[in-house]
Amino acid sequence: MNRILTAFLVITWLGTAHAVELLNVSYDPTRELWRQLNERFIAAYAKSPGGQLTIKQSHGGSSAQARAVIDGLEADVVTLALEPDTDAIRKAGLIADGWQKQLPNGSVPYTSTIVFVVRKGNPKGIKDWPDLVKPGTQVITPSPKTSGNGKLSFLAAWGSVVSRGGSEADALEYVTKLYKQVPVLDSGARGSTTTFAQKKLGDVHLTWENEARLEVQEAGGELEIVNPPTSILATPPVAVVDANAKRHGTEAAAKAYLEYLYTDDGQEIIAKNFYRPVKPEVLARHKADFPDVKLFPMTTVAKDWNDAFAKFFGEGKVFDSIYKP
């Protein structure tokens, strides 16, 4: 085991040697990432003064997962897709104020973006966002009401217009056309992957960069990735659910678990699962895995995340005005 990681575990868990169980409530397409991180972390924990550790995972659309925690799902940590989903749990009194400052990089251990997956040979000739609204092109993406992928797909589409000098009226016209070409809205990212890759519905799938890699790997040459010239910068945060962790007696283990994500070991696992690590030296080692897409921040489309949620995804707001199931 890495000496630095060993020292980190000893310091963090000194005096906490007992069996511990954590529940990590995460967003939809992170199953494979967390299985690998958990396996490595549990092995390290077993060799430390911390004792035995079990980590359970729960996955679904990010906003739906946040609601589940607020409604009583006993998460010790949340690793959701979007800051407002995590902050909604804070507003419910379960996460302490200032949670973004508890871990490095604003509690964001990796970044990602939205890319396109197309059929073999790219028969629709899809290269950029305007191609998605060509007549006869069916687009698969999850619901912005329940899914982080869905929200980011919408914001990336909107931002693809305004980041290139288009007006908000132009962006509204574009997303109105786009969502008329979406035949079904699944509740989460993995459901949309199933719809596109297994049920073979649609011509292009808007999805997380990491999910696209996995989807194409499993498709046996039947699918391809198209990296658009520009897309949104996704910054999924992590946080301890303080009220639950305190009640469970898991605060130290939960904190160490999330701190592990920022170690070289954790960042390497993150990179190998096609999430963009935040440590520059780790990202540099995996540069070939991450195409040079111009990523615009969320502030390109709204003042902040709360503004984006209220403006685009609130009841009766922009998305509701353009999408009629």
Question: Language-model segments: what does each one mean?
Answer:
Residues 2-7:
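Sec-dependent signal peptide recognition
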Residues 121-127, 146, 159-167, 244-252:
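Short helix-loop capping/hinge motifs at secondary-structure junctions, enriched
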Residues 164-229, 237:
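Ligand-binding pocket segment of bilobal, Venus flytrap-like solute-binding proteins
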Residues 13-19:
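Sec/Tat signal peptide C-region and signal peptidase I cleavage site
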Residues 39-49, 130-195:
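Ligand-binding cleft/hinge of the Venus flytrap
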Residues 19-147:
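N-terminal segment of the mature folded domain
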Residues 114-122, 235-252, 269-273:
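A bilobed periplasmic-binding-protein/Venus flytrap-type ligand-binding module shared by bacterial periplasmic
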Residues 245-325:
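Extracellular/periplasmic juxtamembrane helices and adjacent flexible linkers that interface
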